[in-house]
Amino acid sequence: MTENIHKHRILILDFGSQYTQLVARRVRELGVYCELWAWDVTEAQIRDFNPSGIILSGGPESTTEENSPRAPQYVFEAGVPVFGVCYGMQTMAMQLGGHVEASNEREFGYAQVEVVNDSALVRGIEDALTADGKPLLDVWMSHGDKVTAIPSDFVTVASTESCPFAIMANEEKRFYGVQFHPEVTHTRQGMRMLERFVRDICQCEALWTPAKIIDDAVARIREQVGDDKVILGLSGGVDSSVTAMLLHRAIGKNLTCVFVDNGLLRLNEAEQVLDMFGDHFGLNIVHVPAEDRFLSALAGENDPEAKRKIIGRVFVEVFDEEALKLEDVKWLAQGTIYPDVIESAASATGKAHVIKSHHNVGGLPKEMKMGLVEPLKELFKDEVRKIGLELGLPYDMLYRHPFPGPGLGVRVLGEVKKEYCDLLRRADAIFIEELRKADLYDKVSQAFTVFLPVRSVGVMGDGRKYDWVVSLRAVETIDFMTAHWARLPYDFLGRVSNRIINEVNGISRVVYDISGKPPATIEWE
């Protein structure tokens, strides 16, 4: 019998902050399971979840507006600790009898708060001391409204000159509010505050660890599928690879992995996937060479969104054909991860704006003939990588830069042709190889090459040539929501450009993309 790793759990209610998923990831890093739900949950749902504690997230709205979100009243009646962050603190204050006002100026950025009263939340935690020995905390503020009066049964724990109630607490009820973001790294002691709340105040044990997550997932897979056969589309990406390894550990040869080579992969990627999973790990793999079929379907198409849909559609067609050749397969496995689940829920409630169609879920058959197995659906990406390491997958593969689901289909601008893909593959491989050699690969968040369907004149020897252009792209980001272009050294860029132009016959010019996000997206299409 495996240990119940969900026994202690934190419920995070989402009021719309860009940092809310980061709060959840921080709680998981502390070894405690948590889930992220929309703020408008019912009392019955909270009772059913049975949390050890509740966190109210930040959000972009103003509590002073009539129809702004509120925490369900049951949150304050459930008898469990509650931690309000930024907007979460403001709605807590307002709902429990305090007062919030719109501020004339938004407070955004670094601040130092002075701890003026003892509290279990920050006891013994400090970044510095005042002249008279009071603890100071370096924090990150991001708010427009501010609490101007706290509820009568609360005390002020910390304040700044412009924010008199930076931390408030009701120790008896174990209610806490902070007017800053403990989840971001700029709040230097933020993790210690979250740990204090989750581990000490809520008394949650650290049961959520990679080894225990694997044991739990294996047990659940076996319970779900029994002796049935399972099919999985293996792409070689992190999610499908870790899904394959978990299923292989749980059901062995009852798993069949279908690897569709769409001709839109990186240099030598197909061979690497087959070698690693087939030869090294001994998984049962069906290799489907389908380059011609994908490129034929993409012929003449220039629109990025249409290209995505075509690639998704053809993959499903090819995958379905292979599935029909297998006998008695009753389950389809997918590498769905927790952010996909959150995103789908947000889309269903109309609370998210789709910028690009999601690569992973673009074209599932509307009428599933098989049951669905999703062993990663509770996990964030960083957790997937950690359990991948525990399962024996190589670090370099798990921590590779992101690669889009449509592959080179969205890195060749406009119409996708085999000639363009072949040139791009080789140019991109040189860029990545040089980044690794210069010890720059892990210093940037994502780097890749884009093929531009324009010819540019070049000089080779005594002659002129009229060949294609590629752009190098490298960005630095924490969350991929915003990004800065990477300031790579000029001599490095010169070396990469020289190698590409000299070694890849057909490319005459290399440019470097210096666009940030926003306004540009990270991928070109």
Swiss-Prot record:
Q: Does the keyword Secreted apply?
A: no
Q: Which residues does ATP bind?
A: 235-241
Task: Supply the source organism for this entry.
Answer: Shigella sonnei (strain Ss046)
Question: Cross-referenced Gene3D superfamilies, in alphabetical order?
Answer: 3.30.300.10, 3.40.50.880, HUPs
Residue ranges occupied by any GMPS ATP-PPase domain in the UniProt entry: 208-400
- Quaternary structure note: Homodimer.
**Which gene name does the record give?**
guaA
Q: Summarize the protein's role.
A: Catalyzes the synthesis of GMP from XMP.
Annotated Gene Ontology cellular components are: cytosol
Question: What positions does UniProt annotate as the active site of this protein?
Answer: 86 (nucleophile), 181, 183
Any Pfam family matching the protein = NAD_synthase
Q: Which InterPro entries match?
A: Class_I_gatase-like (IPR029062), GATASE (IPR017926), GMP_synth_C (IPR001674), GMP_synth_GATase (IPR004739), GMP_synthase (IPR022955), GMPS_ATP_PPase_dom (IPR025777), NAD/GMP_synthase (IPR022310), Rossmann-like_a/b/a_fold (IPR014729)
Q: Tell me its EC number(s), please.
A: 6.3.5.2
| Any one GO molecular-function label of the UniProt entry | ATP binding
UniProt keywords, alphabetically:
ATP-binding, Glutamine amidotransferase, GMP biosynthesis, Ligase, Nucleotide-binding, Purine biosynthesis
Please list the reactions this protein catalyses.
Answer: XMP + L-glutamine + ATP + H2O = GMP + L-glutamate + AMP + diphosphate + 2 H(+)
Q: Where is the Glutamine amidotransferase type-1 domain?
A: 9-207
Class of enzymatic activity (EC top level)? ligase
What pathway does this protein act in? Purine metabolism; GMP biosynthesis; GMP from XMP (L-Gln route): step 1/1
Question: Which named protein is this?
Answer: GMP synthase [glutamine-hydrolyzing]
